[in-house]
Structure formats: C-alpha cells, structure tokens
Amino acid sequence: MQPEPTAELRHRTVETPAGRLHLVEQGTGPLVLLVHGFPESWYSWRRQLPALAEAGYRAVAIDVRGYGRSSKPEATDAYRMLDLVEDNVAVVRALGEESAVVVGHDWGANIASVSALLRPEVFRAVGLLSVPYAPPGGPRPTDIFGQIGGPEQEFYVSYFQKPGRAEAEIEPDVRGWLAGFYAALSADTMPAQGEPDPHFVARAGGRLRDRFPTGVLPAWLSKDDLDVYAGEFERTGLTGALNRYRNMDRDWEELAPHRGAPIKQPSLFIGGALDASTTWMSDAIDAYPTTLPGLSASHLLDACGHWIQQERPDEVNRLLTDWLATLQG
C-alpha cells in the first residue's frame, strides 16, 4: 500500500553540465537522491518519495539526462558515465546540500555506484536495486556481450549499440513496446521457463518485441502509469536513453584507473530472485565482502522481477528506511 504523501511533490529544474535536469522532491531532512534506469523516469520512484518523506528525508528523484524533462544532448558521448556522475554532484550542490545518500535502480544502480566510487566526499552511502556492484575492469564490454547468445541470437545490449536500430523498432509504437518490455521482466507476466528469452533478438531480422508478452500488464503497472511512461518517450524519443548503452566501451576505458576498486561507504543491495540482472551477476554478489566492505545487507526478494521498487514497494520502502536509519547514528 502506497504511503499517503506528507507534502506535495515539488517539480523543479536545476542547472547541470548537461544543461538542465528535471527533478521531483518531497519531504525535508537528509538528502536521498533517487536515480532511475532504462526505460523509465523519475516516476519510477513514485511509491518511494512519500515513504521517504514520511520517514524524515528529503527525497529527490531525477530524470537522468536524456530522459523526461531533462536535457538531451545530441552527441552520443554526452551520455558517458563520468558526465552522469557529475550531473548527480551538480544536483546535490544545486539543492544547497554538501552530501547525499544515492540510491539507484537498473542503470541508475550503475550510475549510483560509480558516483559513490568517484565522489565519496559527496555520496556518503549508496543503495543499489536490481543491478549488483561490479568494480570497473574485466574484458571490453562489447566483446563480452557480442559472444552471448551464439550464432542464432543477439543479446539486447549488442542490439542497442547501433544508433537508430532499436529506435526503429520502438518509436513507431512506444506504448506497445514499453508495455511488452515491462511485462517481460515482471515476475507475474514474464515468459515461462523454456519460452524464448526476451533479453535476446533473433539474428535473422528479429526484434526484441517478438519475444515480449502481449495483451497483459503486470500488476504494478496501471494503464495510467503506462500513459505517463509512454507519454514521455513519445515526446522525447529513445535515443538519449539508448545512448547510455552506447557508451559502455568508453566507460570501460575511462574508468580503467579504478579497476577492481571497492566502494567503502555504507551500502545496501536489494534484488529480485527472478530478475536476470541479479541472477546473472551472482558472482558479483558473492564478491561483496571485497567489493562492498561497507555493505549493511544484501536482500533477494522471492518471486520478484526486475522492476523491484514498483513490484514490491512496501518491502523496498521498509528495507530502505530501516537502512537509512542506521546511517543517522
């Protein structure tokens, strides 16, 4: 059950290296910065904002650059991780704060973890949802993803690399594509074991949506919620959002000086037991004693898919607020 708001949501725009960045805030107290993933917006945190405000925090959910009402630079390399980290720093400064707890989901978890790694003086703690922390390093990302799936299938990350390719699939029917994508990764509507995996595209002219469920919405997603997401992407297009994937090799090169580096601040991880983003990275979770020495707890929610804070808002809110309370001592 969603908590009743303790104060009205406040929309505002702040200046960042990207130009402008839209955010929504609620509550007063220590700053908690919420960073969404793909393909989402600040709205993905709609059930966390009132809960955090009620618990005594200034909760701020941003539209990451390239999304929603935030700036959308044209250059592909404007979506490199280093720039997204500086956006987060700029938000904290623009809000008149010196530090914040940063919490991210999906790509937002990566952005949050690198923000904490590179700017520990600003981000005093980090919460990660769905995507575990894996330190910079390893083989070149596109080399890894290019080998996944074999000769018949292409991994979705590789499919997203070529500018315009995924846009051509998604943008003619944004609403239908989003509905299918959200359903494909939700616990109550994801394909059954043995059915074609929606993380892959058939190499012979296939589309991602060919493997999505049709005619069904997950329980967490109402038609009104879908209207919000679809309306934003129908207005903005998908290129800014997809450009995050197109910077993975650049990030790998630029973060090389931090190869293997741990995040030492207090941290929290919450994953879904049915989420491929969590299960495929089980080795990263096993390495947490080394990579997240400040880890307070790591939780896997049973029967939960990828959209964790929307699928299981009450549990996520409780875990977040309990953890945040430990940081105030």
Predicted regions and their residues:
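Flexible "cap/lid" subdomain of the alpha/beta-hydrolase fold that forms the substrate-access gate
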Residues: E4-L9, L21, R69-V103, W107-S296, ...
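A short loop-to-beta-strand scaffold at the N-terminal edge of the catalytic core in hydrolase folds
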Residues: T16-E25
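Alpha/beta-hydrolase active-site loop signature
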Residues: P39, V64-G68, Y133, D275, ...
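Catalytic active-site module of serine/aspartate enzymes centered on a nucleophile-bearing elbow/loop
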Residues: L295-G329
